[in-house]
A protein has these predicted regions:
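Bacterial N-terminal signal peptides that target proteins for export
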Residues: 1-10
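N-terminal signal peptide c-region/cleavage motif recognized by signal peptidases
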Residues: 17-18
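Low-complexity repeat regions of mature extracellularly deployed or surface/particle-associated proteins
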Residues: 23-235
Length: 235
């Protein structure tokens, strides 16, 4: 069974969207602007589901733009995908994918966000995570939590921000982990970028780069396993 749901909202007031789709091969497309104080909750079960269009990274057909928003996405099954843009300040997002060969690619927009948080939890093998924030502008005070359990997973995070905190936990073999954080850091009295990571498993690759105009940056990295290659650059 295949279902396609499209929400097109161009509004100035509260929007609440709740959707539960079962059976697999379901698609959800959302184009929502000026969505301050909105709540969006989507649950998909089965295989082959998608939020946004996985074939179009430039125009993924999933856009939520506003402030003080709450986003919850849950996918349970295999070969599911989430692709889109979640843009705004003081907003929270919770993403859960359970199953193998699932993909997650989310962009916080060119101008980023302020004082928000995102929690991503993935369980299964051969999963990918790509998170890009504020490619052309500076943001601040963002919290990103990522937990992945399973084998052959890939994580890529690119952020332009100050005071951004990443908490990433990977459990499994053959993991590849890359994080780049740019933008103005804190002052001598205020921490700048912070990454806390625990990677458990064999043959892991970790690459962390943190830049900024002032110090300090903080990295707490715990790697347990064999054949691990780690590269850390801080400026």
């Amino acid at each position: 069974m295949k279902k396609t749901i499209r929400f097109f909202a161009f509004i100035m007031s509260l929007l609440f969207v709740a959707s539960v789709l079962a059976g697999g091969n379901n698609s959800v497309y959302i184009d929502q602007t000026n969505a301050d104080n909105s709540t969006v909750s989507i649950t998909q079960t089965g295989s082959g589901n998608q939020v946004g269009d996985r074939t179009s990274l430039l125009q993924p057909a999933f856009l939520i733009d506003g402030n003080a928003m709450n986003l919850t996405l849950v996918q349970d099954g295999m070969n599911n995908s989430i692709v889109g843009n979640f843009i705004g300040g003081d907003s929270t997002a919770s993403i859960t994918q359970t199953g193998s060969t699932n993909s997650f690619s989310l962009t916080q927009g060119n101008f980023g966000t302020n004082a928000g948080s995102m929690t991503v939890t993935k369980t299964g093998d051969n999963n990918t995570v790509t998170f890009t924030m504020a490619s052309t502008a500076d943001t601040s005070n963002y919290l990103y939590n990522l937990t992945i359990s399973g084998n052959h997973n890939t994580v890529t995070s690119t952020m332009n921000s100050k005071y951004i905190e990443n908490n990433i936990t990977l459990t499994g073999n053959y993991n590849s982990y890359t994080t780049v954080q740019n933008g103005a850091n804190g002052t001598a009295n205020t921490p700048g970028h912070k990454i806390t990571s625990a990677i458990i498993g064999n043959s892991n690759t970790v690459s962390i780069t943190q830049n900024g105009t002032t110090t300090p940056n903080i990295i707490n990295l715990n790697v347990t396993g064999n054949n691990t290659s780690t590269t850390i650059v801080q400026h």
